[in-house]
């Protein structure tokens, strides 16, 4: 898929009043958001002797999506990142306005700053639900969990408690 693709969501079965096959067939996917950037990175030295793939860079053309992530993307610590349940990290692009107001002049509070693969416009944690199925181009994804921010955000942004603030403000992103 490529950037600026609409994100379409098929309503969950629990939202269907009648479960008859003929009714389910008439429910059409809805455009709920837009992918503004697709970002990938390979792990590199980071902080505290660790490596990280948080410094994701924009992709300019089509990219292959697999069950475990995007082609060319990697994670530094597979115990906590990546895999089928954390294949793509999505982050609402409008959250950056909040962080820029909180921390003016910090260069990392911009698209990609949180290590997201997909910069999303038009939805956020208040509308996204676990189990939502998204169609982006020819790829289908299912929202599996919210992000659990770790210490690497504190290091990246130079703010000792930003991981806790991200959780408190409910601006974590999702997989």
Predicted regions and their residues:
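Extended, acidic-biased charged interface segments
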Residues: 165, 169-175
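Aromatic (phenylalanine/tyrosine) cluster motif
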Residues: 1-3
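A subset of signal/propeptide-processing and intrinsically disordered low-complexity segments
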Residues: 11-14, 138
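Electropositive, beta-rich accessory/interaction domains or terminal extensions
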Residues: 25-155, 161-162
